[in-house]
């Protein structure tokens, strides 16, 4: 509801929310090759922003929606992927303890088209277990806080966070100075 709150506070301008889905390692390529663009906010403004994006991203699906929905999409994606990383790390621990080849398990599980290959490598692309960076830790903890504020017990998200702290004890996200995830 941040965008709605800002629109109520600053009535002389229209504020929209356009979540970015960029990885830190490939942000330029990710931006150039977006597979969808989501714009949330008041209608006249979202139409104007959609028209601006359409000039550059002629084949990319562009979705206009309410700002709360657009904000929620960002949290859904990041928290789902964080959950997938934590699940993969826990399953890797189980495989290691049972003397099972985790990579073969993943290879054969991916024959099931319902399971996508992203975020299943452990260690991940940074050579470490779990998730770090600025987005997943920040967004997961923000959603835990929000869920608690609206009376929902975020037990699954708590489990995701505990597993990440277990497999990534160095907490590298805390070293990211000047980013919201590292600030009190």
Task: Give the ranges of each region predicted by the language model.
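ADP-ribose/adenylate-binding Rossmann-like module
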Residues: 1
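Internal alpha-helical scaffold of NAD(P)-dependent oxidoreductase catalytic cores
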Residues: 7-18, 23-118, 146-153
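NAD(P)-dependent Rossmann-like dehydrogenase/reductase catalytic/cofactor-binding core
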Residues: 51, 96-184
């Amino acid at each position: 509801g941040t965008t709605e709150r800002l629109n109520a506070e600053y009535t002389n301008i229209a504020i929209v929310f356009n979540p970015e889905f960029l990885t830190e390692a490939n942000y330029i390529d990710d931006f150039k090759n977006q597979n969808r663009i989501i714009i949330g906010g008041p209608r006249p403004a979202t139409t104007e922003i959609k028209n601006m994006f359409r000039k550059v991203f002629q084949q990319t699906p562009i979705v206009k929606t309410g700002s709360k929905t657009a904000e929620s999409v960002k949290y859904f994606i990041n928290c789902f992927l964080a959950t997938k990383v934590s699940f993969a790390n826990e399953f890797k621990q189980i495989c290691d303890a049972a003397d099972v080849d985790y990579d073969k398990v993943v290879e054969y599980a991916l024959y099931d088209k319902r399971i996508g290959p992203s975020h299943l490598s452990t260690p991940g692309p940074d050579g470490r277990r779990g998730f770090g960076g600025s987005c997943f830790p920040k967004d997961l903890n923000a959603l835990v806080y929000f869920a608690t504020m609206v009376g929902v017990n975020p037990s699954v998200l708590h489990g995701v966070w505990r597993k990440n702290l277990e497999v990534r004890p160095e907490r590298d996200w805390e070293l990211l100075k000047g980013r919201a995830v590292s600030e009190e």
